[in-house]
Structure formats: structure tokens, C-alpha cells
Swiss-Prot record:
It comes from Bacillus subtilis (strain 168). It is found in: Cytoplasm. The modification 4-aspartylphosphate is found at residue 54. Phosphorylated and activated by MalK. Pfam families: Response_reg. This is Transcriptional regulatory protein MalR. It comes from the Bacteria. GO terms for cellular component: cytoplasm. GO terms for molecular function: DNA binding; DNA-binding transcription factor activity; phosphorelay response regulator activity.
Length: 235
């Protein structure tokens, strides 16, 4: 599990971030801090992997907290979630190692993309000791080999495909259903079926029919690891 600290002085926003976080597998909330000092206290009490950091706070702000963490060489990652849209602030947080930056107000889909991308990279770090340039480009920097541009079928979008594929990856090698994905992504089952059909057509997913407790057929999907690269040209 990835241990998370939310640093947010607005209780309503803090609770919203908490609720959003609870909908994404692989993350565990260790605390919510409303100030610079309370954040340092929680960091001293718990092992934290990721901070969801607001910038504007009374007293010392989030940027000062980020600066302090880097001065102490703390091995913690930061995703900024703030109303601060000034380019100077954004540039400074990125220089200090923020891995993503969400400007309030934001949609759940953007939040989920940020967290899912972070989780994916942590998985890469935990399963590799060395990487080739090709692996580094593909796995961390999301650079793609020069290929002929491939269009998605009509009615499908790259952003939704990315979101659904990220959710599919969270199941790892476990089977899943359309309903499972709908709960993860908050996308309708009707829409999800279109994307699953596409992934089945390009042989990235395997599908089997099973029967539920009341006898109705249920389609169980799992990733076809032998052809997993087939999706890259569409993302």
C-alpha cells in the first residue's frame, strides 16, 4: 500500500480528497494535516510515501513545507492540489520535485489519473533494478516509438481509454467485470462495454463467460499478457 498524507487547511476540501482517495485501490490515508507544523508531526509519526499538498495555508504555506522536506532530504513524493495557478509557483514546485500539479477545482477523473500514474510508476520502481533506455522511455516517461498514427474507433476517446486501462491495470492478474470497472472509474457500464469490446478485438483482453448466483451470464475479463503491448499505440 502507498501511504498518503493530505495537507489541506479547508476541512471540506480535505474530506473531498479523502473520499476521492478511498475510491482508488492501492492507497492508504495516514492522516490529514491542516498546517505546516501538523504535517511535520504526522511525517514524524508515520512512514509517508506521498503527500497531497495544498499551497495556500495560514502561517507557513505548502511551498515552504515542500522546501523544508527537500532541505531535510525526506524521501517523500508530492502531488500539489491547489488553487495556486501562478506559473512561478508551479515552476518552483516542479523544481522541488512535485510529480504532478492539480489546479482547483478539478474533476475526479484528473485526480484518478494523477494517482493511477503515480501508482504505476511505483510498481515499475519496485520491479526493476536496472532499465534500458527503451524501458525507461516507455515505462516512466511515456515516450512512444515512432509508429504510424492509429485512430481509435468512432465513439471512443483516448482520455477515457487511458482511464479505463489504468483501472484495468490495478486489478493486476485478477479477473474483473464491467461492473467492477464502473465502480472504479465512475463511467457507465454501457460506455465501458464499448471499450472492453475494443480491447478484446485488439487481443489485449481475454474474456470468459461465467454464471452468477442467480444464473445470469457474467463476462469475466483478464489481461492477455502475451499481447499487452498492443494497446500502446492507442494511448
Amino acid at each position: 500500500m502507498i501511504n498518503v498524507l493530505i495537507v489541506e487547511d479547508d476541512p471540506m476540501v480535505g474530506e473531498l480528497n479523502k473520499r476521492y482517495l478511498s475510491q482508488i485501490d492501492g492507497f492508504q490515508l495516514k492522516g490529514i494535516a491542516s498546517s505546516f507544523q501538523s504535517a511535520l508531526h504526522i511525517l514524524g509519526e508515520h512512514h509517508i510515501d506521498l503527500i497531497l499538498l495544498d499551497i495556500y495555508m495560514p502561517g507557513k504555506n505548502g511551498l515552504e513545507l515542500l522546501t523544508e522536506l527537500r532541505a531535510q532530504n525526506e524521501a517523500v513524493d508530492v502531488i500539489v492540489i491547489s488553487a495556486a495557478s501562478e506559473l512561478d509557483v508551479i515552476k518552483k514546485t516542479l523544481r522541488y520535485g512535485a510529480v504532478d500539479y492539480l489546479i482547483k477545482p478539478f474533476e475526479f477523473e484528473r485526480f484518478q489519473t494523477a494517482l493511477s500514474d503515480y501508482r504505476r510508476k511505483q510498481k515499475v520502481y519496485s520491479t526493476h533494478r536496472n532499465m534500458s533506455q527503451k524501458e525507461l522511455d516507455a515505462e516512466l516517461f511515456q515516450k512512444k516509438e515512432a509508429t504510424e498514427k492509429v485512430q481509435l474507433p468512432k465513439g471512443l476517446t483516448k482520455s477515457t481509454l487511458k482511464l479505463i486501462w489504468s483501472s484495468i491495470q490495478s486489478f493486476e492478474n485478477e479477473s474483473f467485470t464491467t461492473e467492477d470497472l464502473a465502480k472504479h472509474t465512475e463511467i457507465s457500464q454501457v460506455s465501458i462495454r464499448k471499450y472492453l469490446k475494443f480491447l478484446e478485438d485488439i487481443q489485449v483482453l481475454n474474456v470468459e463467460m461465467a454464471y452468477g448466483t442467480i444464473g445470469r451470464p457474467v463476462f469475466q475479463y483478464n489481461v492477455n499478457n502475451s499481447n499487452i503491448n498492443g494497446i500502446k499505440q492507442y494511448l
